[in-house]
Amino acid sequence: MKINYLITAAILIGITTSAMAQENQNEYRSIFNKKADQKVDHGGYGAFGVGYTTIDSKDAILLSFKGAWVINHSIALGIAGSGFFNNLSKTPNSDEHYLGGGYGGFYFEPIIFSKSPVHLAFPILIGGGGITTIPHNYWEWDTNIHGYDYDVFFVFEPGVELEFNMVKFFRVAVGASYRFTNGILLNYDVDKEVPIDALDGFNVYLNFKFGKF
């Protein structure tokens, strides 16, 4: 008899435990009414940076900005943009040209182990931009000189960043990315075309981020 009582008690305890677990599993949840350990943390940051790339096989400088909303310390969503110009070695009385312009768009950034002092991020930019050719002597006092040509383009730029948490509100990121475009149609002058893939290429950069991460 005692064995039967023990078996019955064990079955009842098992049923009760299972029911309680099922009740917790099936508990109604909503986006705006969460337990403390389920709440999503929100933050944001602004950033500026400087970088190096090549455009039409010539050295070029990049100046960039970013503004992003940070979700749960692990994903950043926002906007980003960069300005650029190449052919930095100016030769007096030269008929060479700059390529100058900029691009920007939607910015998506997964962040891995954000709270670690050193961690990784994988930024992706999708957007568009514009580019123009500018003669080296454009800035001289000659009102007859103008930029010869311009074009617009689509851009997709994935990258990787090594981030350093300097203090709670400030991070430094060393990054590399690759800029893909749909090509550009430009002429330096009537007899010389800009390569269609002149904008495609690797970038390296240094970013300074300020905000709540």
Model-derived regions, located:
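Outer-envelope beta-barrel architecture signal
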Residues: 38-46, 73-75, 116-122, 168-172, ...
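Predominantly the C-terminal beta-signal and adjacent terminal strand-loop region
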Residues: 165-213
